[in-house]
UniProtKB/Swiss-Prot annotation:
This is Autophagy-related protein 21. Belongs to the WD repeat PROPPIN family. It comes from Candida glabrata (strain ATCC 2001 / BCRC 20586 / JCM 3761 / NBRC 0622 / NRRL Y-65 / CBS 138) (Yeast). Keywords: Autophagy, Cytoplasm, Membrane, Protein transport, Repeat, Transport, Vacuole, WD repeat. It is found in: Cytoplasm; Membrane; Vacuole membrane. GO terms for cellular component: cytosol; endosome; fungal-type vacuole membrane; phagophore assembly site.
Length: 453
């Protein structure tokens, strides 16, 4: 079993429960909402939607064979089944999970790596380093982006056509956003259950080889701020480094900002805040977590784009999830270590203390010249800063709160929108846990443990 991911407001959790079966669980109260077979969502499924014809149940593979992205509390689910072969891995299905019916299916020229969506846009990342952006109301292709192209101009002539039926059915489902809310009130039983997980994986396979997966993250609000990692070298350069970030307005289809070399190595994981103003990044090493201003607000030009910097730990870790809460005051970091870290982003004392531009620009001047221009104490401060700027920072701020986990348990987390001080933890040992985040520095308190069936 694999826990795939929470929906955008953490009201539901989608689980790949084995052999092409997807199950949607309500988080509060905890319980099963829907289950259906991925390969039979076109209406030809049996009564309970369960079938076993491709994946091995209980697969121990770290990377799930299924991508599933749920649209808030609606009945819309975007699904990619890579377990049926190469051709199915190139197809995106938009399904109605309540009716177990296929709304539309889109075939792409290459394997699908990731899918993200909100109420306005759905974005699809392919393994040929292209991003397809769709209007979710009618599934019209709005733009294509190339991770190698400097101008990021899409080719609308290569769009994939979807019929009127898709547009009408999607609009109908978007209007029925309270379907799961009604079911949620009935799901306060069935708490006896088992699970597993997947975060979005570190690498993906192409013809047996592995490469770092480009990152794709979309803001939860209707502004649809899309942030994606981009190669900092030319396509001919074998040393492919994914450490540049493009901030893109997916609603108005125009680039907003370009963040250059956010880490020394490849960017392994990203997350954008709900309002699209902040972007969190982690590299392959996973010891440093950085928060950047995306530049979507008018105040970004008044200061550096690097907003906050945290030390997760001294040992390297594969980070597979970063997530902001709804107010962007907390950032959770999940890796393959035995601790889940929660950082505070709203403490002014944590802001980076940059070097003054006018003093720093005098680095080529003589000591005597500097003494004549600024007082003695400022001279000392100047040299302290210059020396410090060339020494790795060993005193970065650490987590505000944490959760101790079994190291072997792969985990996905969610911040429930309706509970400010809670966090959900779904793990591949079959547990679903609810924790309270402390008001002061310390360990999160376990409130409740449930189990996936």
């Amino acid at each position: 079993m694999k826990v795939l991911r929470f929906n955008q407001d953490a009201s539901c959790c989608v689980v790949n429960s084995g052999a092409n079966e997807l199950t949607v669980y309500n988080c509060d109260p905890f319980g099963k909402c829907f289950e259906f077979n991925i390969s039979n969502v076109n209406g030809d499924s049996n009564d309970n939607g369960i079938g076993y014809d491709s994946l091995e149940a209980g697969s121990s593979s770290i990377e799930s064979q299924v991508i599933a992205e749920m649209l808030f509390s609606t009945s819309l689910l975007a699904v990619v089944d890579k377990g049926q072969g190469i051709n199915t891995g190139k197809k995106l299905k938009i399904v109605n999970i309540k009716k177990r019916s296929l709304i539309c299916e889109i075939a792409f020229p290459s394997l699908i790596v990731d899918v993200v969506m909100n109420r306005k846009r759905i974005c699809v990342l392919l393994d040929n380093d292209q991003i397809f952006i769709y209007d979710i109301s009618c599934m019209k292709l709005m733009e294509t982006l190339d991770l190698w192209e400097s101008n990021n101009e899409g080719n609308l002539n290569d769009h994939i056509k979807v019929g009127e039926r898709a547009s009408n059915m999607i609009n109908e489902n978007l209007k029925n956003g309270n379907e799961l809310d009604r079911i949620r009130s009935k799901s306060n039983n069935n708490n006896d259950q088992t699970n597993s997980d997947n975060g979005r994986s570190r690498t993906y396979s192409i013809n047996g080889s592995h490469k770092i997966k480009p990152q794709l993250t979309l803001s939860g609000n209707d502004n649809s701020i899309l942030c994606y990692s981009k190669y900092s070298s030319s396509k001919q350069n074998p040393a492919r480094i994914l450490n540049d970030i493009v901030v893109y307005d997916a609603l108005n289809l125009k680039p907003i900002n370009y963040l250059n070399s956010v880490h020394k190595g490849c960017v392994l994981k990203t997350s954008v805040s709900i309002d699209g103003k902040l972007l969190a990044t982690a590299s392959e090493k996973g010891t440093i977590i950085r928060i950047h201003k995306t530049g979507v607000d008018s105040d970004f030009a008044s200061g550096p784009l690097l907003y906050k910097e945290f030390r997760r730990g001294s040992r390297p870790s594969h980070i597979h999830q970063l997530l902001f809460n709804k107010d962007s005051t907390l950032l959770v970091c999940v890796g393959d270590s035995d601790t889940i870290h929660i950082f505070r982003t709203d403490d002014d004392g944590l802001a980076l203390d940059g070097i003054d531009g006018d003093i720093g620009s005098d680095s080529g001047g003589s000591l005597e010249l500097i003494k004549n221009r600024i007082p003695h104490e400022q001279v000392k401060k100047f040299f302290s800063r210059k020396i410090k700027s060339h020494i790795p920072n060993q005193n970065l701020h650490r987590d505000f709160a944490h959760i101790n986990m079994d190291r072997i348990v792969h985990t996905v987390v969610g911040f429930p929108e309706e509970f400010d001080n809670k966090i959900y933890v779904a793990s591949d040992d079959g547990s679903f846990k609810t924790y309270t985040i402390p008001s002061k520095h310390g360990q999160c308190v376990l409130n409740k443990t449930s189990h996936f069936i």
